[in-house]
Amino acid sequence: MEAFIKETGRAVVIPNDSINTDIILPKQFLKNILKTGFGPHLFYDWRYLADGKINPKFELNKPEHAGATVLITGVDFGSGSSREHAVWALTDYGFRAVIGGSFSDIFYMNATKNGLLPIVLPEAERQILRDIKPDETITIDLPNQIVTYNNNQFHFDINPQWQAKFINGEDDIDVTMKFEAAITAFEKKQPNFD
């Protein structure tokens, strides 16, 4: 997992509430277990018209939003079925963080385990962030748990263990491997049933 300490980048706003995992990545694209290749299918039914052509009105398709690394959204983001693929689509597209009013518990956990930082901010603060212009940047300072935009600073909470994993660029396997010697020693002490 790529370390996340401080991210300064452009943001795109999709202010809708209740964006579920089938909207984030429709079910027909769940045929792969690799974590890459899903970005082109992100928000597929919104990004593309019925004939398969790009929908020029959708925010992600506007040239001024190309390369955005932060998604600002509404409440209840990631509801619906549990699919890590939805998180993989967001990260494969290039998002490093999603700022919302709330997240589905399962989506939140999938995000933290796959290097996508979910940040919960109240409506008043997200309303200020919704005014971000395509040429402006937003900064997320994870060690200090601060989102900065246009001289506004917003504090967010994160579990200290998840924060450490992001800062150190460690997933669950990396953390487990820190205990490899202890695991091996434990295994050697167990009786052999061969």
From Swiss-Prot:
This protein's GO CC annotations: 3-isopropylmalate dehydratase complex
A biological-process GO annotation: L-leucine biosynthetic process
EC number, as in UniProt: 4.2.1.33
Biochemical pathway: Amino-acid biosynthesis; L-leucine biosynthesis; L-leucine from 3-methyl-2-oxobutanoate: step 2/4
CDD domains cross-referenced by the UniProt entry: IPMI_Swivel
Transmembrane segments: none
GO molecular function: 3-isopropylmalate dehydratase activity
Pfam families, A to Z: Aconitase_C
Enzyme class: lyase
Keyword terms: Amino-acid biosynthesis, Branched-chain amino acid biosynthesis, Leucine biosynthesis, Lyase
Chemical reaction(s) catalysed: (2R,3S)-3-isopropylmalate = (2S)-2-isopropylmalate
Self-association and partners: Heterodimer of LeuC and LeuD.
Protein role: Catalyzes the isomerization between 2-isopropylmalate and 3-isopropylmalate, via the formation of 2-isopropylmaleate.
Similarity annotation: Belongs to the LeuD family. LeuD type 1 subfamily.
Name under which the protein is recorded: 3-isopropylmalate dehydratase small subunit
Source organism: Leuconostoc citreum (strain KM20)
Lineage, opening ranks: Bacteria, Bacillati, Bacillota, Bacilli, Lactobacillales
Gene: leuD
